A protein has these predicted regions:
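C-terminal luminal/periplasmic domains and tails of membrane-associated envelope-modifying transferases
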Residues: 2-14, 320, 429-695
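Polytopic membrane enzymes that build or remodel cell-surface glycoconjugates and lipids
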Residues: 1-491, 501, 506, 512, ...
């Protein structure tokens, strides 16, 4: 009797949802724990540190008027990713722990929503004869799909890499939208149903604005409604389809807001036969990664002609050729599983359809910036796991205990692999070295590793690495520019200038293939400026400004040289024009305020600086300059208010308290001035003690 009661309680506990939610969240958090200590890696510098559109809530609407990258050829329209960065920056300032925490929470939340969604969908996919109406096995199957998906290491670049969160955002909002639609259908009250449908549509739009792959979510949604959903009237179906078409129309309209991006990157021009081979190779690689996720790294490729340059490289390429066979075999397995009869056939068909729909955009059918990438499996992997669970559920009941144990073992193995992979993103140097060691030998990775060595002062290592990059890609402008900077540091001035000159001359040709070619041109101008040859420096900068319109770094350099040689009046028109065209640019507003202050036009200086203070909610430079201007005019109360705001934004910076103390002293508040100086002494003492505590 006692055993029967215990068994009954165990069954009841298994049927409850909250223990499963806790397990999913806890395991998902633990396996990615190392990523919380991660620093800026790769594109994080552009999207987090230097991104002007995340520094203030004022840019919530402006984010929809720009592509994700300002100075690149990629037309990634992902404003919601920038909105998430705005929230992170507002809460965490520059603390990267918070950015990584958001990534992790988004992934966990996506996994929880996936479990809820699959629980709803599986009921429509289960045959009448499946488990004799017993849904517990199917519910457990949905749980294991979500759990395996959460811990799978192929998602590392979407979770552990700050810039990779677009996958999680799109997944989260798409899942939420689907669940809201299901809930709306069950609602009785018209107002509640209308609100839920509206929120579902909004979630769908946010998913599309997070990442383009959300279009596949809409196809999956319509596929399920068409072939699997029961009880939906024809009228409701057509209304739903029209609403989705309208949603895509709104998204298409939003994509017209950014300036038209003319991509000059040459097409690969692959013939259809080659694309077919690459599709099979990538399919084989993705299937292998789902089952045996080893040797994980960025810059993957199933097309590497350089692998045939030596015998060892040829042997490596033989493995790539076998991927085509594996891809063909996996495709055959999907087709066979979809047609094989059984109670779980609907589940297998839906899983195979999910995977193939998610795979087609990343299959090399259309040209992308790579032939294969692990994080592209973020959505298709769900279909793979659904298909696998569909195969398992058709096995005899007596095998399910063993299979559940195997699934738990897989969770442990995948979780350990995810934890190890998560540690690859701790620092930029660790990331680049491990990527190279795992086989991701691209010029970009090598160039970034060389720059990381140069930043640490290891110029000999940096030079060797960058010269190796140029042996692989002789025209790579960033590597050429970085090598020139290293050579200057080493005292090889003549070779550095020759390298910068040749890179600048080649820019007209290389800019069609590479972004940021203006960096080498600017470095050459800076080199002439250092040599006091400002006439030559200005000539180079002026030409660069016309060749690369709208690049602030070029305008900033030219205006600074003009200020030094001809005064503030000569520099103001350049900066003023840029600031007028780009109201959101903090650096331009600060520079304009400084120039007006130097000219003596204090009202305009203060207006520009006040505008700048709204563009970055954590930077205090504009407020401190306003305080200094007010202090100079003996407007002590205004200076005090501005500097108090500066201190509130940067309470850990001694210089802010020094200026505050000066203002208080001028106001006759001697005691408060001394308190401010005492805070300076305390902060300096803490700064001296911090290294000792760290050691």
């Amino acid at each position: 009797m006692i055993r029967a009661e215990q068994f009954s309680r165990l069954v009841q506990l298994r049927e409850k949802q909250w223990p499963r939610f806790i397990i999913l969240a806890l395991i998902g958090f633990v396996v990615h724990l190392p990523s919380l200590q991660g620093q800026l890696v790769w594109d994080d510098s552009f999207l987090v540190r230097d991104n002007p559109f995340i520094k203030s809530p004022l840019f919530i609407f402006e984010a929809f008027r720009h592509y994700l990258f300002l100075d690149f050829y990629s037309a990634h329209y992902r404003p919601v990713q920038n909105l998430s960065f705005i929230a992170d920056y507002f809460v965490w300032n520059g603390n990267l722990y918070g950015f990584h925490l958001t990534n992790l929470l988004l992934h966990i939340a996506s996994g929880l929503l996936l479990y809820l969604l699959l629980g709803k969908l599986f009921s429509s996919l289960r045959g009448v004869e499946a488990d004799n109406g017993n849904s517990s096995a199917w519910s457990l199957g949905a749980f294991f799909v979500a759990l395996l998906w959460i811990v799978h290491p192929v998602h590392s670049a979407a979770v552990d890499y700050i810039s990779g969160r677009a996958d999680s955002l799109a997944f989260f909002f798409a899942c939420a939208g689907w669940l809201l639609f299901i809930r709306a259908r069950k609602s009785i009250l018209l107002a509640a149903r209308t609100a839920l449908y509206s929120f579902a549509a909004l979630s769908g739009l946010l998913a599309l604005c997070s990442r383009e792959i959300a279009f596949v979510w809409i196809l999956l949604f319509l596929l399920h409604l068409t072939f699997f959903e029961k009880g939906l009237s024809r009228r409701a179906f057509f209304i739903t389809v029209l609403c989705n078409i309208g949603l895509l129309g709104i998204y298409a309209g939003l994509r017209t807001l950014p300036e038209v991006l003319v991509s000059t990157t040459p097409s690969q021009g692959w013939p259809a036969s080659m694309r077919a081979v690459l599709m099979l190779r990538s399919l084989g690689d993705y299937a292998r990664l789902m089952v045996f996720p080893v040797n994980l790294h960025m810059e993957r490729s199933v097309l590497a002609p350089e692998n045939y340059l030596s015998h060892d490289q040829w042997r490596h390429s033989a493995g790539v050729e076998y991927l085509s066979i594996l891809g063909l075999a996996f495709l055959g397995a999907l087709i066979y599983g979809a047609f094989r009869a059984g109670p779980s056939r609907g589940l297998r068909i839906f899983g195979a359809s999910w995977f193939l729909l998610g795979y087609l955009p990343i299959s090399n059918l259309i040209e992308l910036n790579a032939t294969v990438a692990e994080h592209w499996l973020y959505l298709p992997s769900v279909g793979f796991l659904i298909f696998a669970i569909g195969c398992v559920l058709d096995l005899p009941v007596r095998y399910r205990g063993v299979l559940a144990g195997c699934a738990c073992s897989a969770v442990v193995a995948l979780g350990v692999s995810s934890t190890i992979r998560s540690s690859d993103w701790l620092t930029d140097e660790i990331f680049y070295r491990r990527t190279l060691a795992a086989g991701g030998r691209s010029s970009r990775v090598l160039a970034n590793l060389g720059q990381a060595c140069a930043n640490r002062g290891e110029y000999a290592k940096a030079e060797a690495i960058l010269r190796n990059v140029l042996r692989l890609s002789a025209d790579y402008p960033i590597a050429r520019r970085n090598l020139a900077e290293v050579l200057l540091r080493e005292g090889h001035k003549k070779e550095a200038e020759e390298l910068l000159t040749s890179t600048t001359k080649a820019a007209e040709r290389t800019r069609k293939e590479y972004p940021l070619t203006w960096v080498a041109v600017l470095s050459l101008a800076l080199s002439h400026h250092r040599e006091k040859d400002d006439t030559k420096a200005l000539a180079i900068a002026e030409k660069a400004r016309h060749d690369y319109p709208g690049v602030w770094e070029i305008i900033r350099f030219e205006s600074e040289v003009l200020r030094q040689t001809r005064g503030a009046n000569a520099a103001i028109p350049l900066v003023d024009a840029f600031a007028h065209d780009n109201w959101w640019h903090y650096g331009a507003a600060i520079a304009l305020g400084r120039l007006y202050a130097e000219k003596g036009d204090l009202p305009r200086a203060e207006a520009a600086l006040r505008h700048a203070s709204w563009l970055d909610v954590h930077d205090a430079e504009a407020l401190s300059l306003i305080a200094a201007i007010s202090l100079r005019q003996n407007r002590f109360e205004e200076a005090y208010r501005a500097q108090c705001r500066a201190v509130a934004r940067q309470p850990d910076q001694p210089r802010q308290y020094v200026l505050l103390s000066n203002i208080l002293e001028k106001m006759g508040r001697i005691g408060e001035a001394r308190d401010a100086l005492a805070e300076v002494a305390l902060l300096k003492a803490l700064g001296r003690d911090a290294p000792a505590l760290a050691n």
